[in-house]
Amino acid sequence: MATENPNIVFIFPDQLRPDFLSCYGAEFIDTPNIDWIANNGVKYSRAYSAAPICVPARTSLLTGMNAIRNGVTDNQHFLRSDYRQIGIETLPEVL
């Protein structure tokens, strides 16, 4: 029997705060598609970031490693091209 992969959607917008989404109470904007995902999936009331800036935070989320360990400590660096060879796995690869 084949194993079915989970349906996981990560939305990685830059600088999007919950007060800019109608599913979190914003009244000046309608975000029906994100609202649908929030109402039919998982919606968080608290979030913590592994890094204070974008690229390291996203890389930490995808690798499960902090910025020092995965080597992405600022917005000018990205995950090494040989990350697989040095033993780093990303969430999509694990799933």
Predicted segments, located by residue:
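Formylglycine-dependent sulfatase
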Residues: 1-95
